[in-house]
Amino acid sequence: MKFISWNVNGIRACVKKGFLDFFNETDADIFCIQESKMQEGQLDLNLPGYHQYWNYAVKKGYSGTGIFTKEEPISVSYGLGIEEHDQEGRVITLEFKDYYFITVYTPNSQSEL
């Protein structure tokens, strides 16, 4: 199985710089992105053969995650169940028959840890 995880720092700008060519060349089974920085309806990606799942931040232009997968999952969940954090679109969990796959975008804690 081949999976890729990439912090794109804004998917719309990344698409303009050749994201789709890279995506197609990788032929990943699962492709995760972090820091999508978009809202629902801002971008329509046509990726034949892939199921798409997005978790958007409430705040415009902030965080967000996405997963593209060839195999359709049994279930999809968004967030951690903690409202304060779930508003930022940082977690997507896919359940498959034999495993779970999770993409997470964690904030930089600076020196606060």
What would you call each of these model-derived segments?
Residues K37, L43-S111:
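Structured beta-strand-rich core segments of catalytic domains in phosphoester-bond hydrolases
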Residues M1-L47, A57, Y62:
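N-terminal, active-site-proximal structural segment of metallo-dependent hydrolase catalytic domains
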